[in-house]
């Protein structure tokens, strides 16, 4: 199979090229990313354990005091809730940063492939190439910002309608649902914009002003590619994430039993088991997400090639 980047490809060929490059160059990608994958797994384990154990426990305690015992929250529980919420926010932000840095290690190799049509296996196992980390993080954050602005605008509009216009709640719910779906659909070209920004020079909004329209004109190609690739990855994720999902459900059910007056039925080693499970799951997830990143890379190359040929025909 030919793995040249700039080539006109159908969505099937794009997906095939992305997965093909992943399997043929897995050792290269693993060697370039395994250290950051371990760091990602540690952050994922911390965030996952917090969501699976700590948050359900605090929520159950709050519900027990307010709904069962009909009491005001104790100061200790209120403080613990605020502290846990703060830790959750910090870990979420750290997760975004570490995820961007992790995939930057792969994007470095893709940048090398874009420029030279080949990739060199890293010489050392213990080394992290930091090039493109900052650019990848900015691509993440700016893309989120572009999505967040219309979301906040719609939320503000719904608030105004709710406060000053007599509309049925179902009307507002349907309006919010349609608006959210519209934003999600319009956000797909941002994948092309982000890839073009990360792998080339120029500021994000300078690239955005030129590339978003191009991405929008190829919306069907982007959507179909991401949909099919996403379905494949989601199935694999469902399989490999099953232990973490089962543990989370067990913790939640134990807290529900505690809320109903039953003793907490989780064994003493549950916390350690949850941490280890989420750590291993996080490490595996890096290499489950990676083929989708390579698919987006070839999707970007296919669009670029199409635009180059279109411009030549105009000349």
Where are these regions (language model features)?
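Generic N-terminal leader segments that precede the first folded domain
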Residues: 4-20, 24-27, 34-81, 85, ...
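Generic alpha-helical secondary structure signal
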Residues: 15, 26, 85, 99, ...
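Hydrophobic alpha-helical transmembrane segments in multi-pass membrane proteins
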Residues: 32-55, 84-100, 138-163, 171-187, ...
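A conserved helix-loop-strand patch within extracytoplasmic ligand-binding domains
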Residues: 75-92, 103, 107, 126-139, ...
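C-terminal or late-domain output modules
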Residues: 119-132, 158-171, 182
